[in-house]
Design a protein with these regions (language model features):
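A conserved beta-strand-loop-helix scaffold within acyl/acetyltransferase catalytic domains
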Residues: 2-57, 61-73, 121-231
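Acyl-donor binding region in acyl/amide transferases
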Residues: 71-139
C-alpha cells in the first residue's frame, strides 16, 4: 500500500518510520519541508509533491521525499531546495518490496524532462538500493562531505572541536551578549514577528513572506528546531 503526501496519515507514518531509522536527517522533517513549500509558493514556482510512504502490513517500511519543481515545460525532481531522499527500514524491507519501491519512484522520474536530484547519505559506507539502480542506468554521482555537530555532547567537548578563529568570537559573545533560548515550550509568534520586523528594518527589504516566518515558527513548535537570540 502507498500513502501519498496529500494523505492525512502521511505525517503519522512518516514519524513512525523516522523512529526506526538509525540516523534521520532532520533537515527533511515535515516542518522543514512545509517551510520549503511555502518558499516555493512565494517564488511563484510550479511544483507537485511526489513524496510517498510504502506500507507493509499497515506499517511504514520505506519513504520517498521528492517534489517536481521548476517551470512549465521543464520540471526537476528534488525536495524543493534539497535533493530528494529515501528512508528505509532495512530490517523489514525485502528484495521484492525494493523492486516495487523503485518502480514507483521511476514513474515520477520518467514523467519529467529535467533532472532527478537525489542524496544518498552512505552512513555505513554502502550505497542505497536506489543509488545502485540509478548508477546502473547511467546516473552521475558527485561526492560531497558534510559535518554534523552532535549537540548532545558536553559543552567542553563541543568547544574543544571549534577552530581557533571562531573561539574568540564565541568568547566575545559570552561576555557581551545575553543569549535567550526558545523552543517548543516558550516560542511565540510575537517574538518571531519582532525579529521579522527587525530583519526588514536592518536589511531594507522583506526577504521572506510572513507565511514563511510562520512556517519557521511551526518548526520550533514541532520540536524540529530551536531559536537562540542574543542582545
Amino acid at each position: 500500500m502507498i500513502v501519498k503526501f496529500s494523505n492525512k496519515l502521511f505525517e503519522y507514518y512518516f514519524q513512525e518510520l523516522a523512529k526506526k531509522i538509525d540516523w534521520f536527517p532532520s533537515i527533511y522533517s515535515i516542518g522543514i519541508i512545509n517551510l520549503f513549500e511555502q518558499r516555493a509558493i512565494d517564488n511563484n514556482k510550479v511544483f507537485e509533491n511526489c513524496s510517498f510512504i510504502f506500507l507493509h502490513d499497515e506499517k511504514p517500511i520505506a519513504c520517498f521525499i521528492g517534489v517536481k519543481v521548476g517551470q512549465k515545460g521543464k520540471m526537476n525532481i528534488r525536495a524543493y531546495e534539497l535533493p530528494s531522499i529515501i528512508l528505509i527500514d532495512e530490517m523489514n524491507f525485502s528484495k521484492n518490496q525494493s523492486k516495487l519501491f523503485i518502480l514507483e519512484i521511476e514513474k515520477y522520474i520518467n514523467d519529467i524532462a529535467g533532472i532527478f536530484y537525489y542524496r544518498d547519505t552512505m552512513l555505513d559506507g554502502s550505497l542505497s538500493i536506489l543509488s545502485k539502480h540509478l548508477l546502473s542506468k547511467g546516473a552521475t554521482a558527485i561526492p560531497k562531505f558534510s559535518i554534523f555537530i552532535d549537540l548532545l555532547e558536553s559543552e567542553k567537548k563541543l568547544k574543544s572541536n571549534i577552530r581557533k578563529s571562531y573561539k574568540s568570537l564565541i568568547n566575545w559573545g559570552e561576555k557581551e551578549l545575553k543569549p535567550s533560548i526558545y523552543d517548543a515550550s516558550n516560542i511565540t509568534w510575537e517574538l518571531i514577528n519582532d525579529f521579522r520586523l527587525l530583519h526588514i528594518k536592518e536589511s531594507g527589504t522583506e526577504t521572506m513572506s510572513e507565511l514563511s516566518w510562520k512556517k519557521r515558527l511551526d518548526t520550533v513548535k514541532r520540536g524540529e528546531a530551536f531559536l537562540i537570540v542574543g542582545h
